[in-house]
């Protein structure tokens, strides 16, 4: 009986460790190592699921925001990659704290980020969030002299029909973001 209890305890311990490690591996596979945000694949997966859920509510406008930092390359080239990394971490923290916990924030790569605003029924609310994100990212430029030229070009797209795919929504948001860049940067545009 004592041997059986010891073996059972050992087995339960192994299962607990396995469960924890499995969870750690899943989190690591979904997380951008530098910023702690969702990585591209995980962001796409979570946004796709949330879009499907929001699509059941006919009033949801399902906005996706694409963000590209203006003059980020200048920070990297002038002050080095460690300073660029510090800026990316600050931007990620700023994005995370500037939206609701139900919204999805991810780093697509380099200095590109996405934000999906869940359960939004008014386009004006989404545009107000985009304006706020422009402002809070611009405020980072006052934190360090190395970041003095930082701002963001932001594009917003809306899922106008129920069958739109996340990839299509992202392409539209990205086009709007490039329009913001071409029209002077430090602003948002919609498509």
Where are these regions (language model features)?
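Residue-level recognition of strand-loop junctions within catalytic nucleotide-signaling folds
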Residues: 77, 116-121, 138, 159-160
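Catalytic core regions of nucleotide second-messenger enzymes
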Residues: 58-59, 107, 123, 137-153, ...
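Core hydrophobic beta-sheet residues of small sensory/regulatory alpha/beta domains
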Residues: 64-66, 190
